[in-house]
Amino acid sequence: MKRLLVCAVALIDSDGRVLMAKRPEGKTFAGLWEFPGGKVEEGERPEAALIRELKEELGIDVTESCLAPLTFASHTYSDFHLLMPLYVCRRWKGIPRGLEGQQLKWVIAKDLRALPMPPADVPLIAHLEELL
């Protein structure tokens, strides 16, 4: 079975809210909410991939020193196994915007469970609830 490494981030604002992104139509899991991030390319470090993805998807600049690993998801889908480290980031430059057609929403931790999410994302919520 194919293994896929995807990095994700919980961007946390000064009010303790987490930024969530809604997958746009035409993509796998369209309409579901997820933590921003993306695939790690061959030979790429996870932190570098996350910095690249945040610039491409949200138009924000993040430095590696602002990324703190929190937990990870390990989930088997029908055709691949996903490994997804989740980082926390509380400092970035710029205002997050959905540059790839995705809707964005700031959510307090206790409301995360109300959002429909891909199965791999759901277990990560408990770690954020504990943190926040």
Feature annotation, model-predicted:
Residues R17-E56:
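Conserved Nudix-box catalytic region and its N-terminal flanking loop in Nudix hydrolases
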